[in-house]
Structure formats: C-alpha cells, structure tokens
From Swiss-Prot:
Location(s) in or outside the cell: Cell inner membrane
Regions crossing the membrane: 14-34, 44-64, 79-99, 138-158, 175-195, 214-234, 295-315, 327-347, 353-373
Organism whose genome encodes this protein: Pseudomonas putida (strain ATCC 47054 / DSM 6125 / CFBP 8728 / NCIMB 11950 / KT2440)
Protein name: Serine/threonine transporter SstT
Cystine pairings recorded for this chain: none
Superkingdom of origin organism: Bacteria
Main location: membrane
Length: 403
C-alpha cells in the first residue's frame, strides 16, 4: 500500500469531506476558471448516487421486510408507537420551519423539465400510478414510489420462502450497502468539485444559502430534542420530563454526535438503560429496534431538503400535500438506518411527490453531503438519544401504572 493510501485510510471520511469543502472554496476564490473546469468531479459523484439509489432502496427494503422476525414488536408496542409519533412530529416541525424560513439552493434546472402537481388530488393520483409502475421501469427511471411498492410486496412474499432464499436476499443487501460505502468514499472529491464549481458560477451567495439551510436543519433538531420530545415524554410519564431528557442527551447524544452512527451507539444506550434500572427484556429489544426505525433526525433532513428544492423551483405547496410529505418523510426515515447517507439518498422519493425529477433531486442530495459534516452528526445525536429517552419513558409509565 502506498503512503498516500495509508494516509487516506487513517483519515476519517468527515475530515476528508471538510478538506474537500475548504479546498473547493479556496479554489473557487483563487482560480474560478479552473474551478469551473472541475465541475465534472461533482457530476460524476451525483451520477454515481443516481445509479445506486434505486437499487439500494429496492434491495434494502425487500431484505428488511423479508427478514423481519414475527412477534418482535409485541413486547414493546408502547415504545414502537412513541418512535412513530416522535418521527412524525419531527417531520411536521420540519414542514412548519421550512414554511417559516424557506431555503433556496443553487440548482441547475436546465437538464430536466418540471411538472409541478396541481394539489393533493393530483399528488395522490400520481402516487397511485407510480406505485403500480412496472418494476423494471421504476428502477430504470428512478421511480422511488414504484421501487418501494415492489420492494415491500416482494419482501412480504419472501417471508414465506426458505431460510436459504432469505439469506441470499440479506447477502444482496450487504453487497449493495458495500457499493454505497464505496461511492460515499468518493464524497470528498465530489464535494470538492461541486463546491468549487458552484461558488465559481454563483459566488458566495450559494454558500450563504447552505448556511441558512444548515441553520434550519439544526434549529429543527434542537426544537425536537428540547421541546417536542419532552412534551411526548410528559404526556407519557406525567411529570417534569427535562431531567430524563437532558440525561439522555448528555449520556447518549454527545457520544452519537461524534460517532455519527446509531448502530455504534447501541452499547452506550444499553448501558444507560441498565443504569436507569429499566427492564432488560424491554430495552434489549427496543434499543436495537430504535436504531433501525426511530429516525426523527432523518425525517427532518428529508423534509427540510425536499422543501428547500420545492421553494427553489417555485412550486406551490398546499397544506394537505405538506401533511402527506410529513407522512412520507416519516415512513422513508424508518428505512434510512444502516446506510451511510441513508436519509439523503431517500430525498428523491420525497421529491417525486412534487414532480421533481431525479436529476434535480440528486443535486439536492449532493447539497446534503456538503453540509453533512454537521447535519449527519446532529441527526444521529437526535435519533440515538431519542431511542433511550422513549424506552425509559415507556418503562417508567408502565411502572407507575403497576406500582
């Protein structure tokens, strides 16, 4: 292995993305002509994301549904409902924040034609038509609603298949996830090309747009962590929720912020649950499950970035469509775990509700990677700390009822 590759392997992806980001800004300011010529790096990265996203959603969802263990949720139904309520509430907060503080992105719309929906009826009609699309056509044209429908359908059918078949599906899922990891490893180069060319063409206004977007995202996550989650916990335990909320943020959220992985934070959450004296039979199931489906941060990311694209393109959004987006974002978020940049790669699915084509949706995904250094850390901190918070709230409420 060459010294360069050794350094590359030792340096974390976050550090590489920061270096790519700073190098892109520097090049755009010092040599705008060269920066414009390097736009192809960003285009290659976005094309790779476009290629892998439909296959990723199809295989991942199918494997998840096919390998679901029957009866898993029966022990933890109250916690499961808290997870779903928290994720939906986060999406609603993100919708209102995006309406109050609309973000505008520097997107290239020349390569695609827009077909904005007329209202909720048309959105639902398009949703139904997309859901019954030919599966091969859905994969080719990145029709994520169709891909999702076929993935769930096949997953349910394969539940009754033999163990060997389900193992093959799981292996396929691992293979696709590995390919996604390889694509994500090229994020620093892609971001370097995207930032340098965008700044060279649009000036510093584009960067200020990203800062505004990041402020909306982090603001939503803080609001959910410090206002919405405590309200849900108070409704459950009927006493001051803040000691428990702040304990979970301090003990679980800070670790998750730096590891940027809900899965890596599972041992931390299990240890905290034990210290809180919760039932082991409950938390040993609910914490790993929460790392998979409790995705309030992902719901915020999907909603805010989708509505940023909508505002940039001048598409009008009525209230029923915004509520539908909240539901779709919450459902999408549940499938975003375990994949690097998972929530970002599900943005095209939400964008398709508004008739935004894949070419533009993937530019929004690329913007997500640019701000991902902070966005992903904050998202993981919210997701993981909420796992242990809702588990503790449900266990304490159960004790109060029986005590």
């Amino acid at each position: 292995m060459t010294p360069f590759l050794r350094i590359l392997n030792r340096t974390s992806l976050v550090t590489q993305i920061v270096i790519g980001l700073l190098a892109g800004i520097a090049l755009a300011l010092l040599a705008p002509a060269i920066a414009r010529d390097l736009a192809f790096l960003g285009k290659v990265f976005v094309s790779a994301l476009k290629a892998v996203a439909p296959v990723l959603v199809f295989i991942l969802v199918m494997a998840s549904v096919a390998n679901h263990r029957h009866g898993q949720e029966t022990h933890i139904r109250p916690i499961l409902w808290l997870y779903l309520l928290g994720t939906f509430a986060a999406a609603v907060v993100a919708v209102f924040a995006s309406m109050l503080f609309p973000s505008h992105l520097a997107l290239s719309t020349s390569e695609a034609t827009l077909s904005a929906p007329g209202g909720i009826a048309e959105v639902l009609q398009n949703l139904l038509l997309n859901a019954v699309d030919n599966p091969v056509n859905a994969l080719l044209n990145a029709n994520f609603i169709g891909v999702l429908t076929w993935a769930i359908g096949l997953g349910v059918a394969l539940r009754h298949a033999g163990e060997t078949t389900r193992t093959v599906v799981e292996d396929l899922s691992n293979g696709v996830t590995l390919i996604v990891r390889v694509v994500i490893r090229f994020a620093p180069l892609g971001i370097f090309g995207l930032v340098s060319s965008t700044l060279a063409q649009s000036g510093l206004d584009a960067l200020l747009g990203y800062l505004h977007l990041l402020a909306v995202l982090i603001g939503c996550m803080l609001f959910v962590a410090l206002v919405m989650n405590p309200l849900i916990v108070f409704w459950k335990i009927r006493r001051n929720p803040y000691p428990l909320t702040l304990l979970c943020l301090r003990e679980s959220g800070i670790t998750a912020f730096f590891t940027r992985s809900s899965a890596a934070n599972i041992p931390v959450n299990l240890a905290l649950s034990e210290r809180l004296g919760l039932h082991e039979d409950t938390y040993s199931v609910s914490i790993p499950l929460g790392a998979t489906i409790n995705m309030a941060g992902a719901a915020i990311t999907i909603t805010v970035l989708t509505l940023a694209a909508v505002h940039t393109l001048g598409i009008q959004v009525d209230l029923p469509t915004a509520v539908l987006l909240s539901v779709v974002a919450a459902v999408c978020a549940c499938g975003a775990s375990g994949v690097a940049g998972g929530s970002l790669l599900l943005i095209p699915l939400a964008c398709s509700l508004f008739g935004i084509p894949s070419e533009i949706a993937m530019q929004v995904v690329a913007v997500g990677f640019i701000i991902g250094v902070l966005q992903d850390s904050a998202e993981t901190a919210l997701n993981s700390s909420t796992d242990v918070l809702f588990t503790a709230a449900a266990c304490q409420a159960q004790e109060q009822r029986h005590g």
